[in-house]
Amino acid sequence: MSKDIRVRYAPSPTGLLHIGNARTALFNYLYARHHGGTFLIRIEDTDRKRHVEDGERSQLENLRWLGMDWDESPESHENYRQSERLDLYQKYIDQLLAEGKAYKSYVTEEELAAERERQEVAGETPRYINEYLGMSEEEKAAYIAEREAAGIIPTVRLAVNESGIYKWHDMVKGDIEFEGGNIGGDWVIQKKDGYPTYNFAVVIDDHDMQISHVIRGDDHIANTPKQLMVYEALGWEAPEFGHMTLIINSETGKKLSKRDTNTLQFIEDYRKKGYLPEAVFNFIALLGWNPGGEDEIFSREEFIKLFDENRLSKSPAAFDQKKLDWMSNDYIKNADLETIFEMAKPFLEEAGRLTDKAEKLVELYKPQMKSVDEIIPLTDLFFSDFPELTEAEREVMTGETVPTVLEAFKAKLEAMTDDEFVTENIFPQIKAVQKETGIKGKNLFMPIRIAVSGEMHGPELPDTIFLLGREKSIQHIENMLKEISK
């Protein structure tokens, strides 16, 4: 590439890190690292009403958890928060006012609302009508004096070139253009509280920080012509823009909504449930981008090497919880036991299950986990007297040979000494039941598994029985025999 790559992730500290924002950060990170460029974090905190205490720390902490690092941020550089850059914004506001490219607007919220209502009733497209339209200089001066005397604080609006065409070649979408007359009229670049609006401040920041490429969600497409107007007004070259497609819920086909509480959408949620960060990183990196081929599991280093902005998808990215869980399970299965056990300890401790067998239990169920918090429901059988059965499990236990199998296996366990009760001796006892009763296959193994564990599927049965212990295994079988005899 001919110019230095400088990209940014610029969150507002208004809450937890959403998976859509995490994707924006991740694609900027991969783009910078692939091209040997600079990835920076800037905090856009001009919306004081939505500001959340500790929101900035939460954003950075969750990005680090995902495995991202950055070259510049408020932690290492001054004035990387918009609230620290107000003097810079004011400098360019004053410049545009002096050049007649912006003006102070004294129209009130009530007047704006009344005009919007009139336009709606008339079937007109909502837009701001310049309040000075048709005024002479004397009338304009009198209007301003009257408004200021009434204590009305003005906003500052950019004078829009209604006949202008604002176009760019989007890295993802291709050629896009807007007519200046379709923007909604002159728009506010400075609010009454002195803070700049987003579409003004972001241009000043990107220019000042020499951002070369702006990669973000396609909900920002409508913002781009306004930003191009500011670049034009200040005589600056705009960066390249790339707008990633939205993320949809794979089950509903609708845009992923933060209000959909049935879907985990915040990185903090995945951390709390015990997903591995590498798995979440991997999953997010494939939301709207893929390297080609059939493989879907890649390390961070492989993603950096493979990342190609030309493969950013033009179609919506499907958020598929089942795919994330499959991917997470793959990472957990292949992680070392020490890592997963350390992650499981808080869950086990809270449930009162951090016993001397805890690490063995984690080892036993690690291949089944989609998230580490599942260690609790998976190990319920070790801490209860009778497992809850599903309809399918109850149906299996109504088989006419079930009591015969359970009585025979219970007798085998009772006959074993403590020294004999080891994992490798348990399967031969099951085979002995088969030989004595003539019952085999599912009719043999399934009743024993369900009676002991309350599950139709799970780890190797001898491993489960050994960890459960001889006495508790016998107790579970006795409880099941009582249940099925009712």
From Swiss-Prot:
One of its GO terms (biological process) is glutamyl-tRNA aminoacylation. One of its GO terms (molecular function) is ATP binding. ATP binds at K258. GO terms for cellular component: cytosol. Its main location: cytoplasm. Its EC number is 6.1.1.17. Monomer. Catalyzes the attachment of glutamate to tRNA(Glu) in a two-step reaction: glutamate is first activated by ATP to form Glu-AMP and then transferred to the acceptor end of tRNA(Glu). Belongs to the class-I aminoacyl-tRNA synthetase family. Glutamate--tRNA ligase type 1 subfamily. This is Glutamate--tRNA ligase. It comes from Streptococcus pneumoniae serotype 4 (strain ATCC BAA-334 / TIGR4).
